[in-house]
Amino acid sequence: MAAKGAHGSYLKVESELERCRAEGHWDRMPELVRQLQTLSMPGGGGNRRGSPSAAFTFPDTDDFGKLLLAEALLEQCLKENHAKIKDSMPLLEKNEPKMSEAKNYLSSILNHGRLSPQYMCEAMLILGKLHYVEGSYRDAISMYARAGIDDMSMENKPLYQMRLLSEAFVIKGLSLERLPNSIASRFRLTEREEEVITCFERASWIAQVFLQELEKTTNNSTSRHLKGCHPLDYELTYFLEAALQSAYVKNLKKGNIVKGMRELREVLRTVETKATQNFKVMAAKHLAGVLLHSLSEECYWSPLSHPLPEFMGKEESSFATQALRKPHLYEGDNLYCPKDNIEEALLLLLISESMATRDVVLSRVPEQEEDRTVSLQNAAAIYDLLSITLGRRGQYVMLSECLERAMKFAFGEFHLWYQVALSMVACGKSAYAVSLLRECVKLRPSDPTVPLMAAKVCIGSLRWLEEAEHFAMMVISLGEEAGEFLPKGYLALGLTYSLQATDATLKSKQDELHRKALQTLERAQQLAPSDPQVILYVSLQLALVRQISSAMEQLQEALKVRKDDAHALHLLALLFSAQKHHQHALDVVNMAITEHPENFNLMFTKVKLEQVLKGPEEALVTCRQVLRLWQTLYSFSQLGGLEKDGSFGEGLTMKKQSGMHLTLPDAHDADSGSRRASSIAASRLEEAMSELTMPSSVLKQGPMQLWTTLEQIWLQAAELFMEQQHLKEAGFCIQEAAGLFPTSHSVLYMRGRLAEVKGNLEEAKQLYKEALTVNPDGVRIMHSLGLMLSRLGHKSLAQKVLRDAVERQSTCHEAWQGLGEVLQAQGQNEAAVDCFLTALELEASSPVLPFSIIPREL
């Protein structure tokens, strides 16, 4: 009975030894070795003659104990020197007593030769690892050749032997890489490279099988214990981690994209274990990087298809996979398969993001500082790739939602704050973006790009001019520390002053701000004399204060640097029109539209120039082109999934939807049946306009600029129809615009003009008043209202309204002309003459459209 009990104890210790070697519990090895030796001593009852698993004599047990202790000592030494191993720094035996002791044990075992072939082979594998870490790469390769690792089988072997073999293959590959190349021939080098990749691929597969089997065994043993007792997470050793990733890293480094991607996809398809979760995040991030940076959409192949033949021919498989036991893969019906590289990269990154953000170390205690830094770097790298991926598809809302999830661990992390801020800018959440940028300024106060970005947003979409001025002053206050961004700081401040001048209601304030704007912009030009953007805005500022000749000189300099700039060409056309060279202006606009066919501002200027030069008929034809451009750029399928005909030829028809609908009569001559040129233009415009019938539910979809542009097209067409006295057609156009924005001041103003042309003066006056209520600074509205009040006999009130208009915009010659007419009607001839002279002087330098239509933005 005693012998039977001792035999059971021996089996239990032996099983525990195998488990500890597989799971890496090296601190338990000395105690287990002592128990084993005690049981194996004569009289201990553990000598099991005839047992295939442990038929040791006492000297054999002593050598077996040395093997176990040598492995434990070496693994503990490697754990203590993980950083050096990672940096490929050889460990010196004299500085590492554990490694020295392990080497002595292993040398003794191999010299005695008393152990069974299995354990002698294990000793060689462990000694090969030791040779590698001490920098003896040839000795490591020789030891693995002596052990015969290429012919080893994994069938019916203990788990720890899988780990040893996986590490052996990766170490052999790393050792081959580090051998000197001076003597070897090119053929031998190529052969060696192939052998390295073969070693890495074998190591990867064996490591994955080992980790899957280890988790299965651990879970089974845990299930036999109490519920709620969870197995400890297995910590990957350096060499196991290298085994998992060396194959795809080596292939990608050599330019073998097909094999590298195949390795990565295989790794990601294997059934994961707890130990490989972090590794899979890294692999997914790596594959996403390859898909984004190294593979075009034309060369992409899905995980379930084969790569292009030209790729297949170059990269043959380097080893026979049939001989290896494959890890378990995720399989099943109806698995999702990406259609292109962006889709696959996005899928990988979204999965990686969910795992990485879950594992981020939030604790700020000093002991976890390094872990926190590493986890944050991994998460930030994933978000950077997500920014690239979603940015390519314009999915900025989705990107901002992803980045917002990072805010829970972004405390003090400038890069993440800045990424979130930029994503908010891109998806149109400008106010939120400015709030985030304020925090970024606090985190990095010496970085001029952050306040510049904030100023750009404030100037552009928000028009928060006081905040823009504050941010611009931040950049300027940095002085020389701002470097190349200092001129941009002055540019931002100059544009802010210019916009403030446009918004100012008092002429004295306008003049002061225009002066400050010009001085600041000229300072920016002194700092960056060849910057075309700075020169452009100096020219624009000169144009705004009607220094037309000086503005033209500056603009010529800007065009020398950037000949095809849309804003510069647009300003040139407006300057020509201010000099009354309308044909030159039209030629410039046509040239600019050739370069920038989707620029609506240029198209509207062309309509105005044609209206002045050729009359409303030609302008209506261009209006039709603008409407078609709108339809092309903002198709119904993008907005609401409506049907849309792809053809834009004559006779275009499409299925009409309920909602807005425009029908323009053909304006036939009833007697002769002939059609005037204006009627032809009108019918063509009707043809284009009738295509744009849409449900009102669509109107709130898409950016606001989309619909304000369409409103402007309708109102421009209405103005041209009114000039031709086609009042019914004009009414339909205004009705369409009103369907978009019923209370828009532009719509109310145009309805007032239509009522005025029809002779409904009281209605016109009321509509002008409503428009002025919506837009109290509308000079054009004030002008029309003033003249209407004068016609109705309210001379004093008309004079007040027109004086407000010229005070609000002192360069509006129409307002001066109207004020002169009212003063003349009141008998104030001298004051009227002054107004007429001012109007005449201003009209001589007035463009067809205000210079302020040129966007002032960074």
Swiss-Prot record:
GO terms for cellular component: cytoplasm; plasma membrane. One of its GO terms (biological process) is intracellular iron ion homeostasis. The keyword NADP does not apply. Expressed in epithelial cells of the intestine, thymus, and pancreas (at protein level). SUPFAM superfamilies: TPR-like. It comes from the Eukaryota. SMART domains: TPR. InterPro entries: Endocytosis_PI4K-reg_protein (IPR051722), TPR-like_helical_dom_sf (IPR011990), TPR_rpt (IPR019734), TTC7_N (IPR045819). TPR repeats lie at residues 121-157, 177-210, 414-447, 497-531, 533-565, 566-599, 745-778, 780-812, 813-846. The modification Phosphothreonine is found at residue 693. The modification Phosphoserine is found at residues 51, 182, 647, 678-679, 690. Keywords: Cell membrane, Cytoplasm, Disease variant, Membrane, Phosphoprotein, Repeat, TPR repeat. The keyword Glycoprotein does not apply. It is found in: Cytoplasm; Cell membrane. Pfam families: TPR_8, TTC7_N. It is linked to Gastrointestinal defects and immunodeficiency syndrome 1: An autosomal recessive congenital disorder in which obstructions occur at various levels throughout the small and large intestines, ultimately leading to organ failure. Surgical interventions are palliative but do not provide long-term survival. Some patients exhibit inflammatory bowel disease (IBD), with or without intestinal atresia, and in some cases, the intestinal features are associated with either mild or severe combined immunodeficiency. PANTHER family: TETRATRICOPEPTIDE REPEAT PROTEIN 7A, TETRATRICOPEPTIDE REPEAT PROTEIN, TPR. Component of a complex required to localize phosphatidylinositol 4-kinase (PI4K) to the plasma membrane. The complex acts as a regulator of phosphatidylinositol 4-phosphate (PtdIns(4)P) synthesis. In the complex, plays a central role in bridging PI4KA to EFR3B and HYCC1, via direct interactions. Component of a phosphatidylinositol 4-kinase (PI4K) complex, composed of PI4KA, EFR3 (EFR3A or EFR3B), TTC7 (TTC7A or TTC7B) and HYCC (HYCC1 or HYCC2). Interacts with PI4KA. Interaction with PI4KA is direct. Interacts with EFR3 (EFR3A or EFR3B), interaction is direct. Interacts with HYCC (HYCC1 or HYCC2), interaction is direct. Association with the PI4K complex is strongly reduced by TMEM150A. This is Tetratricopeptide repeat protein 7A. It comes from Homo sapiens (Human). The lineage of its organism: Eukaryota, Metazoa, Chordata, Craniata, Vertebrata.
